Regions:
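Short, solvent-exposed amphipathic alpha-helices that sit
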Residues: 1
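Active-site glycine/GP-rich loop and adjacent strand/helix microenvironment
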Residues: 4-180
Length: 180
């Protein structure tokens, strides 16, 4: 997905960076000089690794796409964002919520509240009864209906914990002992 958007942007400076801190610093400096917005997208564990180098990304948009993928201990999204904000010297972290089984994603602009497209619906199920749903404001497991999945299953049950509100939904973490 990121590769597609990089191609569409026609920005020659777009690139993938793994652990090349020097390249990240060069790209950051160049974006600032050109008055371009830098968008850094990465999985949680990789962003945490980068944040430990203390690069000032206060002018960048940082978007985590979730998941420690077994590389680090799972922590809450709130704790993750606090560490990333401190490490990158920024006030907020944007987020993407989705998985390879879905065609659509939900996005948060940095306050932890995710919003979906009109064809995607998130429902919060009871943690102890997978056939029951909880009221708005209560915590439970996240179920997703994605009508964009026209050639595959349009609904999935995740092992993520969440809470729905009037303005969207929050992802609070994973069920204990759930698979990565």
């Amino acid at each position: 997905m990121v590769s597609h958007f990089m191609d569409q942007s026609e920005c020659r400076e777009s690139t993938f960076i793994s652990k090349d801190i020097n390249l990240l610093e060069q790209k950051t400096e160049k974006a600032l000089k050109l008055k371009k917005t830098l968008l850094l997208i990465g999985v949680s564990h990789a962003l945490l690794d980068l944040s430990e180098f203390g690069i000032d990304l206060s002018e960048a948009i940082i978007m985590e796409t979730g998941g420690m993928k077994g590389k680090r201990l799972e922590i809450t999204r709130g704790d993750l964002h606090k560490l990333l904000c401190e490490g990158f010297n920024t006030s907020r972290i944007h987020s993407e919520y989705g998985m390879s089984e879905l065609m659509s994603q939900a996005y948060s602009l940095g306050e932890g509240m995710f919003r979906t497209s009109n064809w995607m619906k998130v429902m919060i199920r009871d943690s102890y009864d997978p056939f029951s749903y909880v009221k708005s404001g209560k915590t439970g497991g996240i179920n997703v209906i994605d009508l964009a999945n026209i050639h595959s299953c349009s609904f999935i049950e995740t092992k993520d914990l969440g809470r729905e509100t009037d303005s969207g939904f929050e992802v609070l973490g994973r069920f204990d002992n759930s698979d990565v």
